[in-house]
Design a protein with these regions (language model features):
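N-terminal secretory targeting signals
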Residues: 1-3, 189
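Active-site scaffold of zinc-dependent metalloenzymes
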Residues: 8-70, 78-85, 89-90
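Post-HEXXH active-site segment of zinc metalloproteases
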Residues: 84-118
Length: 189
């Protein structure tokens, strides 16, 4: 079945169904903005299940991950990178590192994940990409379901079982001042 141009698609798009032209335009704008915020973007073959890493100075993507997922991972890891190098956000990170209570940890983890998502949404808007809010929000919720299941069940769930659609749209937040420094490598899976 031939795919329709983006302007002919009616309704929301599901995660995994973004038209390539929109992805390429977004990619060009977002990669430029990530670099202008002081982060280097690299490609490297990562050990599965890792799909991307960040260390406060650069964001690494696995080239074997499909392009739509790379777009999301870059936005999301940009958000996490900002969290780790923005002095204003440092106090929030301690809750992730010192909780023995699983439910409390998951609550803080959700806050952390969605704050990164709000930062990613701000980056999208700052480069003039405002028509993909629902796509990004659905990807964020899908990612959260995936991460939460991993922490609850102890194994990586099938991505398809976590897919979400028509989720509440993520509200962007400001990108605070950054002080770039190397931090412990963290990864997406």
């Amino acid at each position: 079945m031939p795919s329709l141009p983006g302007h002919e698609i009616i309704g929301t798009r599901m995660v995994g169904e973004m038209p390539p032209v929109e992805l390429v335009d977004m990619w060009i704008r977002v990669t430029s903005a990530v670099v202008k915020h002081g982060f280097e973007i690299r490609y490297r073959d990562l050990e599965p299940p890792r799909t991307g890493t960040f260390n406060g100075l650069h964001i690494v993507l696995d080239p074997d991950v499909d392009f739509e997922m790379q777009c999301f991972i870059l936005l999301h890891l940009f958000g996490h990178s900002v969290q780790w190098v923005a002095p204003a956000l440092q106090p929030k990170l301690k809750f992730l590192q010192c909780s023995d209570d699983k439910e409390e940890f998951l609550m803080h983890l959700r806050d952390y994940e969605f704050e990164a998502a709000r930062i990613g949404m701000r980056l999208l808007h700052s480069v003039g990409v405002t028509q993909l809010d629902q796509w990004y929000s659905d990807f964020v919720e899908t990612d959260w379901r995936y991460v939460e299941r991993f922490y609850r069940e102890g194994e990586i769930p099938p991505w398809e079982e976590c897919r979400a659609s028509s989720c509440p749209v993520i509200t962007p937040c400001d990108i605070p001042e950054l002080e770039h420094r190397e931090v412990e490598v963290r990864f997406a899976f």
